[in-house]
A protein has these predicted regions:
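Conserved structural-core and active-site-/substrate-pathway-adjacent residues in large, well-folded domains
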Residues: 208, 300, 337-339, 409, ...
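Aromatic- and carboxylate-enriched substrate-binding clefts and catalytic-loop regions
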Residues: 305-568, 598-602
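Generic recognition of flexible, low-complexity loop/linker segments
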Residues: 194-197, 204-206, 296-301, 332-335, ...
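Short, glycine-/Ser/Thr-/acidic-enriched flexible segments
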Residues: 215, 222-224, 316-317, 351, ...
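Membrane-embedded alpha-helices of multi-pass membrane proteins, especially ion channels
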Residues: 43-53
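Catalytic and substrate-binding clefts that recognize carbohydrates or anionic sugar/phosphate headgroups
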Residues: 53-274, 283-286, 297-302, 600, ...
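Carbohydrate-binding surfaces of carbohydrate-active enzymes
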Residues: 26, 30-39, 43, 303-304, ...
Length: 674
């Protein structure tokens, strides 16, 4: 059986009353000491963490080249590009596809390759930076490639406008120079028709951006891309949502600020007589058109303006073509007689109305089913033309991926040119992606601006008397590009947008362009304003071609008519030789013919934002009035150390200075020669 253990005497002194009281008094002190210890522990931990954080710099080099390098900035999560050896800031890219709070990449997965840096945010995206072969002498280039690791990741990189002026990219409705002042929501970086979509991108577009710090950003044509412009903050490149596509582009940094590396070179350049007189007479029948053309030419002769080109629009061309295209050879060329001694320009487009004889005839042949863009057919089904809208009509659009379709279309254009006796053929509607506009899957060869690029290459085979309405990766072709219509007012959608457009086109390699008609061709706030007409005329005098929609005798007084004659003569005698001279330089060096003020003052921040002056080559500065009612303006003379002669007053001024309140009456345009 179990027995209870016997208690034993331990020899301890029994606790007295004062001992118990002392223990009760010391208990709170023990608790306080414990709390103090915990507090000290936490303080030490926080101190160690803070010390580590302070010891680590806010920026960490991730890839260095010879002349520049890339860093990762903690906190906001940004890639930085800096020039060496001084570390001059060149570019800041805010990264929107990975957590900004994540520390800088601690591990380089490409550590074995000194020309690359790789890091992966395991749940979001992978980044790969690489040193690339230089795009031009004196430059250093970096490839940036983001790859999404989940289907729902949208890659987005934003390029800061802080202390950087940006140029290039797309044309827009109210063109700005630089594009820092532009605003646009995120939308596909594809050319478009501004008349149909004023908030979209315009017909001239390159995936090329140039910064005043000496940096360029170039995106490959096969990258699906959206662009947003946030005025005076940043512009952003991002991939379409839900498609898990990579985002990659190239950064190049140059010692030149901004860089002046050549773009596209060509061995040939187009020719176009000036001025162009646009026909806006009756178009109801071939007989009415011919009478209208004769009447226009008679008036031009009467006013001693009998030179240049008479331009017939698409509708007038179609009416004449229907009357003059007869099966037999009985009908002789009659159209040249209509406009002699001027030349004739006709207008075509890659569209055909679904009820038009052209479209219906094209469907008769066996091959003709492939002449038009079509939706991808289901297995076993026949293709259906992708119908779109052009000038308010339901139309089909030429299939530029079909050699048979292009051959048929070009043969028709040549036949029309011959029968109508035209010297020039203008093509409208070259811009845009019809599949993208209708949210239809795009064939791989027509991604982005593939349509514009393919059609431009085909049209260039017609010769250098060809004009197209858009440009994308086609600046190397001997084609004239028709600028977008402008409003008849003084805004950036009107007169103030003309010089920014000139600089934009020329910078991207499109030096041979036809500006909108003098005074603007879209209704604006001041239609028929003689002052607007004159100030517009003074600018286009110095451009490749002078174009008129409203003849001067209809809009203005006799003195404006006389001024028009003087401007046409000045264009022929002074401007055309300059353009020929600098077109040779463009072909050999790739430098634009029309240059911004910063071209001669690349280190002066004042020059970066001047949008109402332009240079022809390095020797002529044009500084017109673009404000209503003004007869004076401030003029920046670029090029410190140069001397500029005012052609109106014969006064000489130093370059690198600003002339304040310089006088220019309505009959004058300030022009300086170096």
């Amino acid at each position: 059986h179990l027995t209870m253990p016997l208690s034993r005497h331990t020899g301890q002194i029994p606790e007295s009353t004062w001992t118990l009281g002392f223990r009760e008094m010391t208990e709170p002190w023990k608790g306080a000491v414990g709390c103090l210890g915990v507090a000290v522990f936490f303080a030490m931990t926080i101190g160690i963490i803070s010390w580590q954080a302070l010891e680590q710099p806010p920026e960490e080099w991730v890839l260095r080249g010879r002349d520049a390098g890339m860093l990762w900035e903690r906190g906001r999560g940004a890639l930085l590009l800096r020039a060496l050896p001084a570390g001059r800031p060149v570019l800041a890219i805010a990264v929107g596809s990975v957590p900004a709070t994540e520390p800088p990449p601690p591990r380089d997965r490409c550590w074995h390759d000194g020309r690359q840096f790789c890091y992966s945010w395991e749940e979001d995206a992978e980044l790969r930076l690489s040193l690339e072969p230089p795009a031009a002498p004196g430059t250093e280039c970096y490839g940036v490639r983001w790859t999404p690791l989940r289907p729902d990741v949208t890659l987005k990189d934003c390029f800061s406008m802080a202390n950087v002026s940006w140029y290039g990219g797309p044309s827009i409705r109210a063109q700005r120079w630089p594009l820092n002042g532009a605003q646009s929501p995120a939308q596909p970086l594809v050319s478009g028709d501004l008349s149909a979509n004023p908030d979209g991108f315009g017909p001239l577009l390159e995936r090329y951006f140039l910064g005043s710090t000496g940096v360029t950003v170039t995106v490959a044509p096969d990258v699906s891309l959206l662009l947003s412009l946030e005025s005076h903050r940043q512009f952003c490149l991002e991939t379409p949502a839900g498609r898990a596509e990579p985002l990659h582009y190239q950064l190049c940094v140059s010692a030149d600020c901004p860089p002046r590396s050549p773009k596209h070179l060509t061995r040939d350049f187009p020719t176009c007589r000036s001025p162009i007189w646009r026909y806006h007479g009756p178009e109801g029948s071939a007989a009415k058109i011919k009478r209208g053309l004769r009447s226009l030419v008679r008036r031009l002769k009467r006013h001693r303006l009998q030179e240049g080109v008479v331009a017939l629009g698409e509708r007038g061309t179609a009416v004449l073509a229907a009357a003059d295209l007869v099966p037999s050879g009985r009908r002789k060329r009659q159209a040249p007689e209509l406009v002699e001694p001027l030349e004739l320009s006709i207008t075509l487009s890659p569209y055909a109305g679904v009820t038009s004889p052209l479209f219906l005839r094209s469907l008769r042949g066996g091959e003709a089913a492939g002449y038009w863009l079509s939706r991808q057919p289901r297995p076993g089904a026949s293709s259906i033309p992708l119908l779109t809208t052009w000038k308010g009509q339901l139309c089909a659009r030429l299939n530029v991926t079909s050699e048979a379709a292009l051959g048929w279309y070009l043969a028709r254009a040549r036949r029309l040119r011959q029968v109508l006796g035209a010297t020039y053929v203008a093509f409208e509607g070259v811009e845009g992606n019809s599949f993208l506009e209708q949210d239809v899957p795009v064939p791989a060869e027509l991604e982005g601006d593939g349509y514009t690029e393919a059609l431009a290459a085909a049209l260039a085979t017609l010769g250098n008397g060809t004009v197209i309405s858009a440009g994308s990766r086609s600046s190397h072709l001997p084609l004239f590009v028709q600028m977008s219509p402008l409003r008849s007012d003084w805004s950036h959608a009107g007169l103030k947008g003309l010089i920014p457009s000139v600089l934009h086109y020329s910078l991207l390699g499109y030096n041979f362009f036809i500006p909108d008609a003098v005074g603007g061709s879209e209704a604006g706030a001041t239609p028929g304003d003689p002052e607007l007409f004159v100030r517009w005329l003074q600018i286009v005098t110095f451009l490749p071609v002078m174009a008129f929609g409203t003849p001067p005798w209809l809009c203005c007084d006799t003195w404006v008519l006389n001024l028009t004659r003087q401007c046409i003569q000045r264009h022929r005698d002074f401007v055309v030789p300059l353009l020929l001279k600098y077109s040779e330089e463009w072909q050999s060096l790739g430098y634009p013919i029309f240059r911004p003020a910063w071209w001669l003052s690349p280190m002066d921040p004042v020059a970066f934002t001047i949008e109402d002056e332009f240079l022809i080559g390095d020797e002529v500065l044009v500084a017109p009035i673009t404000e209503k009612g003004q007869t004076w303006r401030d003029i920046y003379l670029p090029g410190q150390g140069h001397l500029w002669l005012d052609t109106n007053t014969a006064r000489v001024f130093d370059g690198g200075t600003t002339l304040r309140n310089y006088s220019a009456s309505l009959a004058e345009v300030p022009v300086f020669v170096k």
